Amino acid sequence: MIFEITSRKEWMSILDSVDTYDVYHTYDYHHLSLEEFDRPILMVYVENDIVVGIPLIIRPIPDTDLFDATSVYGYPGPVSAGITLNFDASKMAKQVHSFLRENNIVSVFSRLNPYIPHQSLILGELGSVNIAGPIVGIDLTLNMTQQRERFSRRLKTQLNKAERNMIVREGSGIEDITLFHEIYTESMDRLNAVDRYYFPLPYFIDLFDSDQINAKLLLAECKTTGEIMAGSIFTISKEIVQYHLSGTYDEFLDAMPSKLLIDHMRKYCSNKNFLHLNLGGGLGSNTDGLFRFKKSFSPSLRSFTLWSYIVNKKAYKKLVKKHKAENLSDNLLFPEYRS
């Protein structure tokens, strides 16, 4: 049986019934930054003791009566209970395909979560799952000494210096949230970030208002002047802690305060039954300077993967043909008909 859920209570009831989930699967996170006409759903498959939930955002395709599905920013993908290595993905795939066709959904794209088990197995008969690049995680099952032993030598030196010059405090209230928004926006401007990496102030206010997301803001403060140098937002779920967003004022870049913030969160999360502190990867999943910055904390890498599924091939080809006729350059992203 397959059905969709759109209510907050029922959505969280399904999440509470699965083996594990991340903040990127919650109802509240799916309602943070919707575009006009976007509709978040949790597509649920149930068979005997098996439960699979796939969170999606359904979007209308302009100038048509068709739709496609995408995922939130972050690491969502399927969550499940009762899945074993003998799981028959083909049975679920038939029902998912029928559900999507009945709802005029042409294609599905979703980022996946490398810390949630069985995602590739569940999606094995539905389109393709491709590796986008590596991400870095700190193993929180190790004790703090073992974790620090995996730091690069240079990072240890930088942290020692940072601890002498800065203090870390937890941000709270609208003033600190507004301050972080300012720091983050300045950082995105410096990096010439594309629009999708910018978030308005109400996004951050709603983020911290949610009891499902459980966000924590850490701020690095200069010991001598009291100036705030940088801020980082972490999200906390059942087993997974995420390094969600971070920013540093331009004038303090050389001091690398964000490294101290990550280390502070690492210490906070240790010995609390969390399994992973995910630092993410490089910009656009590349092994760039951002990736190397994160890798200095841990050699533990996992593959960040993307799920793509063409539900209605005829409609998809027609949309791609129309897009190419109206645009000078090809779109290498999925789906190809979106610019």
Over which residues does each language-model region extend?
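A conserved beta-strand-loop-helix scaffold within acyl/acetyltransferase catalytic domains
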Residues: I2-N48, G53-D63, L112-D254
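Short, high-confidence coil segments that cap the C-terminus of an alpha-helix
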Residues: D38-P40, E102-I105, K272-F274
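Active-site/acyl-donor-binding loops of N-acyltransferases
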Residues: L42, P60, L121-T145, K272-S339
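Aromatic (often tryptophan-rich) hydrophobic motifs at membrane interfaces
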Residues: V44, K94-H97, Y203-K318
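A short, structural micro-pattern
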Residues: I50, V72, N104, V129-A132, ...
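Conserved acyl-donor/pantetheine-binding loop and adjacent beta-alpha core of acyl/acetyltransferases
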Residues: R59-Y75
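A gly/proline- and charged-residue-enriched helix-loop-helix capping module
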Residues: T70-P117
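A short, internal acetyl-CoA/4′-phosphopantetheine-binding micro-motif in the GNAT/acyltransferase core
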Residues: G74-N86, T141-L142, S246-A255, L283
